[in-house]
């Protein structure tokens, strides 16, 4: 439904809102449980001329998306082998699903920490050393750790969400092994 609405908006208004549409389409599969997708179509002056909305997916509180189930299973397997998991999530702003994933993982019995942008770049390595000593999983946006940090204690890397910046992806992937 969202895809068809966006195609209609492109036909009607051109490509001015492709950036917002791209972000919405990339994040919607993971955030559809939490957020209705609402994309404003703006004209050249910035005036909103239309809005495209996709409804929030109605799940019972205990229901998980298949991707969430797979993450829990992977973390369980890695923990059984004494391996910590570094879980990268691209959309940590207006479509942040870290709180939901942290709750799901904690309810499954894992110790989870989440690094966010409020930790100053020069203090991130110390924050990680101090706060993840007993953690099983670290949730983080790859932009926060793409350069200058060694995350050797997290040998398993999961790109739960992938953006479109290949440089960030490659840099973040190398944090655990260099």
PLM region spans:
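Conserved Helicase C-terminal RecA-like lobe
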Residues: 1, 7, 11-138, 143-149
